[in-house]
Amino acid sequence: MGSLNSIAVLGGGAWGTALAQTAARAGRKVTLWEHDAGNAEHLIAARESRFLPGVRLEPSIQVTRDLAEAARADALLLVVPAQVLRQVVTSLQPLIAPRTPLVACAKGIEHGTHRFMTEIIAEAAPAAIPAILSGPSFAADVARGLPTAVTIAATDAACAQALAQAMNSGSFRPYHSTDVRGVELGGATKNVLAIAAGIVEGRQLGASALAAMTTRGFVELVRFGKAYGARIETMHGLSGLGDLTMCCSTPQSRNFSFGMALGRGEGIESAAHGKLAEGYYTAPVLLEMAQAKDIDMPISTAVAAVLGGKLSVDAAIEGLLTRPLKAEE
């Protein structure tokens, strides 16, 4: 695959804007597509995102509401919520050239179908090359040019390398991989585990409990990954252990802060602060997929039960602490 000189970013929220900034700093021609008229007008007039106040858009970034214009780019970064990805890709499908890389930048699993992000892309745009970008990265850090490393994966090795090269800037370092399943699985699973870690923090159960929750959560991530075909080295890498460690340690993570609010006794609507964390949607799907392969995932199961109103936070914690003793894996 040749050089990817133009990049379109679909989604003008915090993460989309941050990735557009990165691509521009890497020397790419960047188009930032935003479907919401108000947000698009603000981006154009103020040259900054409402979600990243104080961060000026790079001068070379062009903002548009025209999907056809964005679709002409050499590669497209799809920075939209996991549950609307299929709708966006379906709209894109007739507009893109064959073998255009479509890079999912959301971390989740589709409700009802149990499809991962690249599977949705493959189904909705069969002529495209599906890819995934994931890893320990907060939008505010990336937008401000702070050092960040992520993984970009595609089954087409040349495509993965070209995407990594296209997004590489002085502070944003992408590693490339062909383990698509491992990369997207790590990001989706950690969303749920970060809620559990946040509950521990919100309940003020202490640093020891938080370390135990994070470590045993990683065991669940590895179990799930092995069962669904991920490579062990990917799960120990940026998109697995790296992302989990970050999101289980700071309220900058929406899933962690959501869990903290639940741990303090807030209801789900109050804890969401107007926008539910992706882990809320992933938890029941993750549980169904774990049950389908008889994977033991007690922490994820407890989170799903709390979010589904089947267990209180205290009952979930007690259930985990009273499980039969076993050898450490």
From Swiss-Prot:
Assigned GO CC terms: cytosol
Entry keyword Transcription regulation: no
Subcellular localization(s) per the UniProt record: Cytoplasm
Residues annotated as binding sn-glycerol 3-phosphate: K107, G135, S137, K190, D243, S253, R254, N255
UniProtKB keywords: Cytoplasm, Lipid biosynthesis, Lipid metabolism, NAD, NADP, Nucleotide-binding, Oxidoreductase, Phospholipid biosynthesis, Phospholipid metabolism
Reaction catalysed by this enzyme: sn-glycerol 3-phosphate + NAD(+) = dihydroxyacetone phosphate + NADH + H(+); sn-glycerol 3-phosphate + NADP(+) = dihydroxyacetone phosphate + NADPH + H(+)
Pathway(s) annotated for this protein in UniProt: Membrane lipid metabolism; glycerophospholipid metabolism
Molecular function in Gene Ontology: glycerol-3-phosphate dehydrogenase [NAD(P)+] activity; NAD binding
EC number of this enzyme: 1.1.1.94
Principal location class: cytoplasm
UniProt record, GO biological process: carbohydrate metabolic process; glycerol-3-phosphate biosynthetic process; glycerol-3-phosphate catabolic process; glycerophospholipid metabolic process; phospholipid biosynthetic process
Active site location: K190
Annotated positions binding NADPH: W15, H35, K107, A139, R254, L276, E278
NCBIfam families in the record: PRK00094.1-2 (NF000940), PRK00094.1-4 (NF000942)
Sequence similarity: Belongs to the NAD-dependent glycerol-3-phosphate dehydrogenase family.
Role description: Catalyzes the reduction of the glycolytic intermediate dihydroxyacetone phosphate (DHAP) to sn-glycerol 3-phosphate (G3P), the key precursor for phospholipid synthesis.
Name the record gives this protein: Glycerol-3-phosphate dehydrogenase [NAD(P)+]
Organism per entry: Rhodopseudomonas palustris (strain ATCC BAA-98 / CGA009)
Lineage: Bacteria, Pseudomonadati, Pseudomonadota, Alphaproteobacteria, Hyphomicrobiales
Gene designation: gpsA
